[in-house]
Amino acid sequence: HSGQTSDALINPQHAGAGDYAAQCLSCHGTQGLGQEALQAPALTSLDPVYIARQLRHFRDGVRGAHPEDTHGSIMAASSAGLSDASIADLAGYIDALPNVLPAATIKGDVAQGEDYHLNLCSACHGSNALGNVALEAPALAGLNDWYVLSQYEKFRGGLRGAHPEDRWGVQMVRLAPAITDTDILESIAAYLATLPPEA
């Protein structure tokens, strides 16, 4: 880790601050805004229930276990020693961070991306891309555009969502072959990058 301590944290008194400093800060940053060079996404727009589920999946080998998922294996190692209580505290800590819309990095057709999102993604992720609690589908608004692309490719390539205990990921694996055109994916990601995360 980079030697940064909990002193650099936004809310060092929070129950999840110590684990965030030890396990998350060096890749995801003080404000949870991530680093593209490390393929570490911004976390601040993610729902705490979703964060906790993903951390458990990494810890339990449901996600990040594919031998070709280099970045997922880093998350699996970082999550390995976390208890359910620590995961809940971490999710709460991340949820308390200010939401920041990540900078756009992909040049796509935003208007077409909106149309594609409404036709292909909104049934589960919502027309405003803020997710669907009943379906436990995560928000896509507020995610890094490059992360949306990389995760879609992982679903399509079987690096994510292939584990039988990942019932949500399995749905994405089934749906991912529907979009093979890179321009369409980039347009969707570019559109999502314009949507503010839920406050």
What are the functions of these language-model segments?
Residues 6-33, 106-130, 199:
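Sequence/structural segment immediately N-terminal to covalent heme-attachment motifs in c-type
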Residues 1, 77-102, 174-199:
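C-terminal capping alpha-helices of c-type cytochrome domains
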Residues 22-26, 66, 89-92:
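Intrinsic, low-complexity N-terminal interaction/targeting segments
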